[in-house]
Amino acid sequence: MRSHYCGDVNKSHVGQEVTLVGWVNRSRDLGGVVFLDLRDREGLIQVVYDPDLPEVFNVASTLRAEFCVQVKGLVRARPDSQVNGQMKTGEIEVLGQALTIINAADPLPLSMDNYQNNSEEQRLKYRYLDLRRPEMAQRLIFRAKVTSSVRRFLDSNGFLDIETPILTKATPEGARDYLVPSRTYKGQFFALPQSPQLFKQLLMMSGFDRYYQIVKCFRDEDLRADRQPEFTQIDIETSFMSSEQVMAKTEEMMRGLFLEMLNVDLGEFPRMTYNEAMRRFGSDKPDLRNPLELVDIADLLKEVEFAVFSGPANDEEGRVAALRIPGGAALSRKQIDDYTKFVGIYGAKGLAWMKINDLSLGLEGIQSPVLKFLNDSIVNEIVSRTGAQTGDIILFGADQATVVAESMGALRLKAGEDFSLLQGEWRPLWVVDFPMFEKINGNFHAVHHPFTAPRGVTAAELEANPANRVSDAYDMVLNGCELGGGSVRIHNQEMQSAVFRILGITDEEAKEKFGFLLEALRYGTPPHAGLAFGLDRIIMLMTGASSIRDVMAFPKTTTAACPLTNAPGFANPQQLAELGIAVVEKAVKTED
């Protein structure tokens, strides 16, 4: 039905007859000549119809937005005065000689020109129209090219694309599972995988030493701008490779991807330990474009008569950190109050501050409500450590170390945006040496997952002192976003059982949930390591989209619903009976 895509026609085709198909982007009747902008996935082209062919001209005059049409015509160069540098095809146009309406379009339920006027609900309900917009189409085309590039790289490096099951067993991986009832085994349920983690480890045990899969994963969790109930991972696992080798290979892949797709050389990725990242930036995924850093000052404040500072300074689990903002002395009291409310979202009880109005005046040039609690040497040392200059402000966080890291880390990011401090376009890094466990409400939890190997200890040593052990794990971070994370896996039964015990998983529970894994670890399991990238997040960053919903063809809303298909929906009584399921209606309270 066509000879060319609309966006592919150029000056080399001048004088040629072409057949095009697509949708009417816009139609204009200007003084007896109809100008038609025809659109397909590759772009727009201008088609001109004049009254010399009255039958065709009359049909062209009836066209409206989103009619699906076929156009036949002659490519000609535009006059210099009419060249449109904003269009890929702006140097040429097509003189229409034939026109067929393939399918008419009713008046549209959403705006195609001013899509900002459409609600998120409208865009998702009529997604097939929203995806016709060039911006959306280009993102999906870009996504397809990214996955093609990733496959080529992994294929050429000996990785095998192997599918793993979608219907599997529920395992504790941090989020709630989506459950699928079994008709055959009434009362029992499959779970949709949160990741192919255990199956890819079993593939390593099966001898497939380089595996990958671009795979759908499912998590029933509260949604944010960068979360969806179903998402796509670039999943990778290797045998007989160290963490250094896995990082080197996947870094090579990511650098090649950015060079091919964006012509961006990311350079070598620096390394940073988890502890350093938390100390300097208050985050395990720091945005290195932001030059602001947290500075520890607890050692200066142990003896001050200001409990807000001295309390955390003398607490082993406390922290006092300072954040210098260049030019921040210009902040009004209201703006400082807004920052105080902001850190309160993250659990901070307040936000002390110190304005450096004129450093040449010494303490006379410094303004702060806490100045009366600090002697000259402490103030001078704070100014020195933070590198504060005239016109700066120093903000203070004092609380439990976790609260200080989270609140001041978030404030660092906000201030970096507010003061336009970001430097450079792309700043990747590896974050390594994560803690093996974290304690929540007195119980140990795996920082990554329970199959991550500790670094350099035996099972007995791990159980003797789990709190201070480091995992052989690594996260790739770009511009403050975690692109992917991975680790060396546990490859012997003794260590895996020890980790389960530390996590409070009894032997009986471990056998019930992970018996197949513990059994497999008895039969010559090779050392193995891997990593998984969030494909949706990578595409979002590379295209500059504001949400992963804008780089997925048919995403869900923030309430995990699909307005297009009205999913989820109710099952009919026959389906429920076949599954042996009874729906319990939510109890309604009635007043006595």
Swiss-Prot record:
GO terms for cellular component: cytoplasm. The keyword Transcription does not apply. Residues 197-200 are annotated as: Aspartate. Catalyzes the attachment of L-aspartate to tRNA(Asp) in a two-step reaction: L-aspartate is first activated by ATP to form Asp-AMP and then transferred to the acceptor end of tRNA(Asp). Its EC number is 6.1.1.12. SUPFAM superfamilies: Class II aaRS and biotin synthetases, GAD domain-like, Nucleic acid-binding proteins. One of its GO terms (biological process) is aspartyl-tRNA aminoacylation. L-aspartate binds at residues 173, 219, 448, 489. The keyword Transcription does not apply. PROSITE patterns: AA_TRNA_LIGASE_II. GO terms for molecular function: aspartate-tRNA ligase activity; ATP binding; nucleic acid binding. Homodimer. It is found in: Cytoplasm. Pfam families: GAD, tRNA-synt_2, tRNA_anti-codon. Belongs to the class-II aminoacyl-tRNA synthetase family. Type 1 subfamily. Gene3D superfamilies: Bira Bifunctional Protein, Domain 2, GAD-like domain, Nucleic acid-binding proteins. It catalyses: tRNA(Asp) + L-aspartate + ATP = L-aspartyl-tRNA(Asp) + AMP + diphosphate. This is Aspartate--tRNA ligase. Keywords: Aminoacyl-tRNA synthetase, ATP-binding, Cytoplasm, Ligase, Nucleotide-binding, Protein biosynthesis. ATP binds at residues 219-221, 228, 482, 534-537.
